[in-house]
Amino acid sequence: MTELRQRVAREPEAPPEDKESESEAKADGETASDSESRVEAVTQPPSADDTPEVLNRALSNLSSRWKNWWVRGILTLAMIAFFFIIIYLGPMVLMMIVMCVQIKCFHEIITIGYNVYHSYDLPWFRTLSWYFLLCVNYFFYGETVTDYFFTLVQREEPLRILSKYHRFISFTLYLTGFCMFVLSLVKKHYRLQFYMFGWTHVTLLIVVTQSHLVIHNLFEGMIWFIVPISCVICNDIMAYMFGFFFGRTPLIKLSPKKTWEGFIGGFFATVVFGLLLSYVMSGYRCFVCPVEYNNDTNSFTVDCEPSGLFRLQEYNIPGVIQSIIGWKTVRMYPFQIHSIALSTFASLIGPFGGFFASGFKRAFKIKDFANTIPGHGGIMDRFDCQYLMATFVNVYIASFIRGPNPSKLVQQFLTLRPDQQLHIFNTLKSHLTDKGMLTAATEDK
């Protein structure tokens, strides 16, 4: 007995469970607190010039200010030309480009997180990030395919099954990724892994959701896609030009190069541009008609009878303005009035998407999201305002433009059982008869 007591006294006292968890939390906390210093050490980009050699030689005699002006200008014209080309190629190509832009933006944001924390060797971080991107895209675009390609989906048996159980399949895919994340948790990196889990989901919310709304805007008519994007591009260009030549007063600390002169000049230029572009595009059916799938030709069609938004109307000019310009009325498309709201948002609120991105880049001490486009940075640097604009346009259409869609009602009607269809038919017939829109003679026939 004495020997046993001596042995117990010699053995070190086992640490209580609370102390163990406390030490774990402390170690984990130290790991998280080190992340800020890691940002400086890891993500500081090398000061390399990504300008093409041809432009470097041609602009070698210019100052850095004017060299940047010409580089940005030339690349901007190239991007505008590319934008015209993809518009000419039609809605299907536009949707593919939107998907490519979405994937590239996601890659740029996730890469920043990976560069900061890759030294910790977090298991499955990149794999799970891309897996969740696949899951979310399957969920969103599966719904879109069902909505806009209903007859095609119902015609093909595999697509019909996928459509019927779409949400369950989407949930199962996400749940699989969730379980994989839980299984990947490592004792010394708990907090950091949850940081990156949140990082991935916020990125998905910003990038995938917004690009999904862009696709929906496109299906409402190409004009709802082209005008908002063009307004953001115009505001970006004109704000830069006004700021370059007249900028004196700083606008916001997050972006020291942004000035009030550029902000105000960009606003007025964008409103005028939006009115002119809307006037030109409203006269073409290929721009104003909703994008629909034709089952007979298995292709997209943009042919319809334009709605009242795209028919010229005469408006009375306020008396104050009449005395200045001498006109009493003006003929314009109702859509031009809506374009003022779009261009105003693109000029006054849209830049805050850029300020948000600037704050993000400052937090990680990087200049650009990537160096994909010389003089401009990454793809995300060009689309930081576009995503905010896409959300506004979608909400604007749903609130002020879109009404009941007869074609979708017919699609839903055709999915019902025959007895349900007959019940709706009799109810509708009685309703139309009571309204006097369906006479007894017509009913007998």
Swiss-Prot record:
Residues passing through the membrane, by range: 79-99, 132-152, 166-186, 213-233, 262-282, 340-360
Reactions this protein catalyses: a 1,2-diacyl-sn-glycero-3-phosphate + CTP + H(+) = a CDP-1,2-diacyl-sn-glycerol + diphosphate; 1-octadecanoyl-2-(5Z,8Z,11Z,14Z-eicosatetraenoyl)-sn-glycero-3-phosphate + CTP + H(+) = 1-octadecanoyl-2-(5Z,8Z,11Z,14Z-eicosatetraenoyl)-sn-glycero-3-cytidine-5'-diphosphate + diphosphate; 1-octadecanoyl-2-(9Z,12Z-octadecadienoyl)-sn-glycero-3-phosphate + CTP + H(+) = 1-octadecanoyl-2-(9Z,12Z-octadecadienoyl)-sn-glycero-3-cytidine-5'-diphosphate + diphosphate; 1-hexadecanoyl-2-(5Z,8Z,11Z,14Z-eicosatetraenoyl)-sn-glycero-3-phosphate + CTP + H(+) = 1-hexadecanoyl-2-(5Z,8Z,11Z,14Z-eicosatetraenoyl)-sn-glycero-3-cytidine-5'-diphosphate + diphosphate
EC class name: transferase
Phosphoserine carried by residues: 21, 33, 35, 37
Subcellular location: Endoplasmic reticulum membrane
EC number: 2.7.7.41
One matching Pfam family: CTP_transf_1
Pathway in which this enzyme or protein is active: Phospholipid metabolism; CDP-diacylglycerol biosynthesis; CDP-diacylglycerol from sn-glycerol 3-phosphate: step 3/3
Start and end residues of each stretch annotated as Disordered: 1-52
Domain of life: Eukaryota
Keywords recorded for this protein, A-Z: Endoplasmic reticulum, Lipid biosynthesis, Lipid metabolism, Membrane, Nucleotidyltransferase, Phospholipid biosynthesis, Phospholipid metabolism, Phosphoprotein, Transferase, Transmembrane, Transmembrane helix
Compositionally biased residues, Basic and acidic residues: 1-39
Membrane-related topology note: Multi-pass membrane protein
Residues that bear Phosphothreonine: 31, 51
PROSITE patterns assigned to the protein according to its UniProt record, in alphabetical order: CDS
Main subcellular location: endoplasmic reticulum
Keyword Membrane in annotation: yes
Any one Gene Ontology BP term: lipid droplet formation
Cellular component, GO annotation: endoplasmic reticulum; endoplasmic reticulum membrane; membrane
Family recorded in the similarity comment: Belongs to the CDS family.
Subunit field text: Homodimer.
Function: Catalyzes the conversion of phosphatidic acid (PA) to CDP-diacylglycerol (CDP-DAG), an essential intermediate in the synthesis of phosphatidylglycerol, cardiolipin and phosphatidylinositol. Exhibits specificity for the nature of the acyl chains at the sn-1 and sn-2 positions in the substrate, PA and the preferred acyl chain composition is 1-stearoyl-2-arachidonoyl-sn-phosphatidic acid. Plays an important role in regulating the growth and maturation of lipid droplets which are storage organelles at the center of lipid and energy homeostasis.
Annotated protein name in UniProt: Phosphatidate cytidylyltransferase 2
Organism from which the protein derives: Bos taurus
